[in-house]
A protein has these predicted regions:
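His/Asp/Glu-rich mid-to-C-terminal helical/loop segments that flank catalytic regions of hydrolases
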Residues: 240-244, 325, 445-518
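Bacterial Sec-dependent N-terminal signal peptides
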Residues: 1-23
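N-terminal hydrophobic or amphipathic helices/low-complexity stretches enriched
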Residues: 21-64, 71, 76-79, 285-289, ...
């Protein structure tokens, strides 16, 4: 009896294996094999991140990236072009050198902020001072303002610790950790209140300091991790603005507090390039049966320039480029057109994708599905239905074709809610197109690489990025081949608990097409 049962089970399993083998899609199998055995991710990452570098809108590096992508797509036999959608302030970063000259000599770790005017070759040398404490009111601050003339002013709060909270939590006593957090919270509250009493906030006070004759602005936007600062743009029009790493910034702050009168020299060589055109890079594999319907692969191409934009959004860019390469090689005649958009100026407000949506209503109207990736190097772990009522019907069908070793990590949320911002999928969702964000595993993204001075090639987890390229290519293939057109029916959004009013679907917003003007 046992022998007979074992024989039946064996036949069952062999039959099941045969059925599975018969069900394997040769296109999907070839995509997986190509991605694993002939991946181009590493050389693409090197060319984009090490050679081209950061991709701040309006810079020569951004233009170089656009041209590089077009050439790369054409080398794969994929039609590609740069589509102009606006203009921006042209600017090019040069060498930044920041040195403390007194009370001792030390080179400081920091950089000029984006779109900041250049200094002379000799730079600017001046004493460093702090903002006053215990400001009574705006009149009190006005009386103090003449003190900034000819001085560098420290405009960020002096952090009480350079150790991130997770390090405290691991090693400190509970009492010490709680004490530090309480003191830091109190210090932060007083810092903001002090500026408010002066009639300003952390941003607006910079203009007042420049107008009062400050020689320059020194900031430090710590990202709550070892050695990481967030790097954005300057708010001064004529004087240098630099961001210093926490260790050097707090040292200068203490020296100024204790009356040691530190002096620094800042040399910041940048170039103003006038008004320059801004682009999206578009590539497409034309559909053979329904070319007027589109699957869109989406990733913003620009970055802030504190580092090289490896995980924001170099990795998203790599995923989409590799997916397109895989599709062109193993699915060269798709049923629907597969288009990839590498958007410009996402960091300043989704400008490139909003411009594409505004300029291409016929394409947007005929989007079968859009897949966007923009939050780091990790494997995709979450996909939301974005508020489309029937998203489960087709997304679950497409995901079923993806290997289990990839989908086992993915949580789905249906029907989900529409995104009003955050990344470029939101531009399409607002226009009613079924656009889905492929949300990635954290890998300490928010503290260590997002908009920081450490967002570099070495932070990429290529195994995860490879999985994401396979996932994206298969989703695009399945969406293209689907016999059914995807539904755009939207959920009824819930009431806003704060206002008591019905929530509404996000509205399309126009891009900023003439950016970077002072």
């Amino acid at each position: 009896m046992k022998i007979k049962l074992h024989f039946i089970l064996l036949v069952f399993f062999l039959s099941s294996a045969f059925i599975v083998a018969q069900d394997k899609d040769p296109v999907i199998e070839s995509i997986i094999t190509e991605a694993n055995e002939n991946s181009q991710l590493e050389p693409l990452a090197h060319e984009l991140l090490d050679v081209v570098g950061p991709r701040l809108v309006g810079t020569p590096q951004m233009q170089k990236a656009h041209d590089w992508a077009v050439a790369k797509y054409k080398s794969w036999g994929i039609e590609a072009r740069n589509e102009k959608w606006g203009e921006w302030r042209g600017w090019e970063r040069g060498i930044t050198h920041i040195d403390m000259l007194s009370p001792r000599v030390q080179t400081l770790q920091g950089m000029q902020l984006a779109w900041n005017p250049s200094t002379s070759e000799d730079g600017v040398t001046a004493e460093v001072i702090t903002l006053p404490e215990n400001i009574k009111d705006s009149l009190d601050f006005v009386k103090w303002l003449p003190n900034v003339e000819g001085k560098f002013v420290l405009v960020s709060m002096k952090q009480p610790t350079g150790r991130p909270d997770y390090n405290w939590e691991e090693f400190a006593t509970e009492e010490s950790f709680e004490k530090m957090k309480d003191e830091r919270d109190a210090q932060s509250s007083e810092w903001r209140a002090n500026l408010n009493r002066a009639g300003y906030n952390g941003r607006s006070v910079i203009g007042a300091l420049e107008d009062a004759g400050a020689a320059g602005i020194v900031a430090s936007y710590w990202s709550r991790g070892f050695g990481v600062n967030k790097i954005f743009s300057a708010r001064t029009k004529k004087i240098p603005t630099v961001d210093l790493e926490l260790e050097d910034y707090t040292m200068l702050y203490r020296l100024a507090e204790y009356g040691d009168k530190p002096t620094i020299r800042v040399v910041a060589q940048s170039k103003e390039l006038g008004r320059v055109p801004t682009f999206n890079t578009i590539a497409e594999i034309k559909g053979s049966e329904i070319p007027e319907e589109y699957i869109i692969l989406s990733a913003h191409f620009d970055s802030w320039d504190g580092a090289t934009g490896a995980t924001d959004n170099g990795t998203g860019t790599l995923v989409m480029m590799e997916a397109m390469r895989l599709l062109k090689k193993h699915y060269p005649n798709p049923k629907r057109t597969i288009l990839v958009g590498h958007w410009g100026s996402e960091e300043q407000g989704l400008n490139g994708s909003r411009a594409f949506v505004e300029d291409n209503p016929e394409i947007v109207k005929n989007v079968q599905a859009l897949f966007n990736q923009d939050n780091g190097t990790g494997r995709v772990v979450n996909i939301s239905g974005a508020g489309f009522l029937h998203a489960y019907d087709y997304l679950s069908r497409w995901l079923y074709a993806v290997p289990r070793d990839i989908t086992q990590h993915i949580e789905t949320n249906f029907p989900g809610t529409p995104s009003g911002g955050g990344s470029d999928n939101a531009s399409f969702v607002a226009a009613g197109a079924p656009a889905f964000n492929l949300s990635a595993l954290n890998w300490s993204y928010w503290n260590y690489t997002w908009h920081t001075n450490r967002d570099t090639y070495d932070k990429i987890i290529f195994d995860d990025v490879r999985n994401n390229a396979i996932l994206t290519a298969i989703l695009a293939y399945m969406a293209s081949e689907d016999d059914e057109r995807t539904s755009r029916e939207k959920i009824v959004l819930p009431m806003n608990s704060r206002t008591g009013e019905q929530r509404t679907w996000p509205e399309p917003r126009s891009p900023q097409r003439d950016g970077g003007r002072n």
